[in-house]
C-alpha cells in the first residue's frame, strides 16, 4: 500500500500533525476556539495592512491625506481601512478572552506556552500602538507623545532614550517613518512567535475544562474541531463585517478626524479602548515613575500566574470561591476600562485608584489564598 502523502511529505507532515491528525481532548468547549480565531485575525490584519501600506505615505505632511485618499479614491479603500481598524479591536477582544480562559482553566501551568503567549500579547500591544500613530490625526500624535514620553521616567537614561526613540526633540517625521517600519515588521514577528507558541502547546497537548489528563480520551482534530473552528471564523467575520459596514467609527476617537497639530492639545488624551484598563492603572498613581512601573506590572504580573497557583485542582470548574474572585477581577477590568476613558477629576480619580489596588490584590493575594483555603475545605 502506498504511503499517505500527508503523513510522509516533509512539509505536509507538519501541517498534518498540527491541524489534521492532532490528538485533541474530546471535551474542550468553545473557549478553546480563540486560539484559531487569533490566527485568522492575524492573517486578516496582515492582508488588509499590506493593501493599506501600498497606498500609505509615511510623511508628516502627507500621511493624513494619504489615508483620506485611500478611503475616498481607492477601490474599496474605505472597506479595507475599516476592516483593518476594527480587526484590531476584534484581535484584542479575542486575545483578552483567550487569556481569561487560560486563567480560569489553569492553562498557565504549561509555563512555556503561557510565557510565549504573554510575549505575543506584549508584541501585539506594541504593534497596535505604533499602528495607531500612522493616520497622523490629533489623537495619533498626542497619544504617541504621551506614551513615548513615559520612557523619560526611567532614571538616568530616560530622556536620552525618548529622544533616541523620537529621532529628534519631539514626535516628528523621523518618528512617523520608524513607526511605519515597525508596524510593518512586528506582525511578521507575531507570526513567528505564534509558531513557537504552537510548538510548545503541541509538546504538552491541550488543556481541557476538567483540568485532568485526557490521554485516554482524545479524538482527531479534523473533522471534529476543524468544523468547530470554521463556525468560529464565520461568526468572527460576521461580527467584523457588521462593525466595518454599519458603525466603522464606533470604537475610534472623533479627535483623529483632525490632522495632527503640535500646537493644539486635545482636551482629553486617551488611547484606543483596548489599552484603557492599563492607562487607568498608569494614571492612578500620582508619581510618574510609579505610574510607569504599575503600568508594566499590570501586564507582567501574568508571568507570575504559574507561581501563584496554590490549589490542588487545576481549573476553577469545581472551585466556586475562586470563580467568584475571577468574575470580580473581570468586573474590575471593566471598571478600569471605563475609568481610563474619563477625565482626571473627582470621583474618577479615587475609583481608578481603588480599582487598580483591587486588580493587584485579587491577582497577588486573594486568588492564591483562596486556592489554599479550598484545599483545606476539601479535607472536610
UniProtKB/Swiss-Prot annotation:
Binding site for a ubiquinone: 202
Topology relative to the membrane: Multi-pass membrane protein
Protein name per the record: Cytochrome b
Oligomer and partners: The cytochrome bc1 complex contains 11 subunits: 3 respiratory subunits (MT-CYB, CYC1 and UQCRFS1), 2 core proteins (UQCRC1 and UQCRC2) and 6 low-molecular weight proteins (UQCRH/QCR6, UQCRB/QCR7, UQCRQ/QCR8, UQCR10/QCR9, UQCR11/QCR10 and a cleavage product of UQCRFS1). This cytochrome bc1 complex then forms a dimer.
GO biological-process terms attached to the record: mitochondrial electron transport, ubiquinol to cytochrome c
Source organism per UniProt: Phalcoboenus australis (Striated caracara)
Free-text comment on the cofactor: Binds 2 heme b groups non-covalently.
Binding site for heme b b562: 84, 183
Gene Ontology CC: one annotated term: mitochondrial inner membrane
Amino acid at each position: 500500500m502506498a504511503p499517505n502523502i500527508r503523513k510522509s511529505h516533509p512539509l505536509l507532515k507538519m501541517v498534518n500533525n498540527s491541524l489534521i491528525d492532532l490528538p485533541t481532548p474530546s471535551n474542550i468547549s468553545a473557549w478553546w476556539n480563540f486560539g484559531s480565531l487569533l490566527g485568522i485575525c492575524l492573517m486578516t490584519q496582515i492582508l488588509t495592512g499590506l493593501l493599506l501600506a501600498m497606498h500609505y505615505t509615511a510623511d508628516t505632511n502627507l500621511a493624513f491625506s494619504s489615508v483620506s485618499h485611500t478611503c475616498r479614491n481607492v477601490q474599496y479603500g474605505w472597506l479595507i481601512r475599516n476592516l483593518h481598524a476594527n480587526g484590531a479591536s476584534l484581535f484584542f477582544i479575542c486575545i483578552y478572552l483567550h487569556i481569561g480562559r487560560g486563567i480560569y482553566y489553569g492553562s498557565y501551568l504549561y509555563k512555556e506556552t503561557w510565557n510565549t503567549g504573554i510575549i505575543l500579547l506584549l508584541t501585539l500591544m506594541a504593534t497596535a500602538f505604533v499602528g495607531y500613530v500612522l493616520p497622523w490625526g490629533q489623537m495619533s500624535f498626542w497619544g504617541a507623545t504621551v506614551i513615548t514620553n513615559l520612557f523619560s521616567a526611567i532614571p538616568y537614561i530616560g530622556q536620552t532614550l525618548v529622544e533616541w526613540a523620537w529621532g529628534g526633540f519631539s514626535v516628528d517625521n523621523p518618528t512617523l517613518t520608524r513607526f511605519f517600519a515597525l508596524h510593518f515588521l512586528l506582525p511578521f514577528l507575531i507570526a513567528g512567535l505564534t509558531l513557537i507558541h504552537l510548538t510548545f502547546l503541541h509538546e504538552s497537548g491541550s488543556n481541557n475544562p476538567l483540568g485532568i489528563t485526557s490521554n485516554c480520551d482524545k479524538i482527531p482534530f479534523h473533522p471534529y474541531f476543524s468544523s468547530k473552528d470554521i463556525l468560529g471564523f464565520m461568526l468572527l467575520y460576521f461580527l467584523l463585517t457588521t462593525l466595518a459596514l454599519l458603525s466603522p467609527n464606533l470604537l475610534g476617537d472623533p479627535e483623529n478626524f483632525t490632522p495632527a497639530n503640535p500646537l493644539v492639545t486635545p482636551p482629553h488624551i486617551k488611547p484606543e479602548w483596548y489599552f484603557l484598563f492599563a492607562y487607568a492603572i498608569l494614571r492612578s498613581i500620582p508619581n510618574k515613575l510609579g505610574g510607569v512601573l504599575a503600568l508594566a506590572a499590570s501586564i507582567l504580573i501574568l508571568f507570575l500566574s504559574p507561581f501563584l497557583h496554590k490549589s490542588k485542582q487545576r481549573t476553577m470548574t469545581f472551585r466556586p470561591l475562586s470563580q467568584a474572585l475571577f468574575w470580580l477581577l473581570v468586573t474590575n477590568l471593566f471598571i478600569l476600562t471605563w475609568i481610563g476613558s474619563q477625565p482626571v477629576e473627582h470621583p474618577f480619580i479615587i475609583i481608578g485608584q481603588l480599582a487598580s489596588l483591587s486588580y493587584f490584590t485579587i491577582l497577588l493575594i486573594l486568588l492564591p489564598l483562596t486556592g489554599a483555603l479550598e484545599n483545606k475545605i476539601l479535607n472536610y
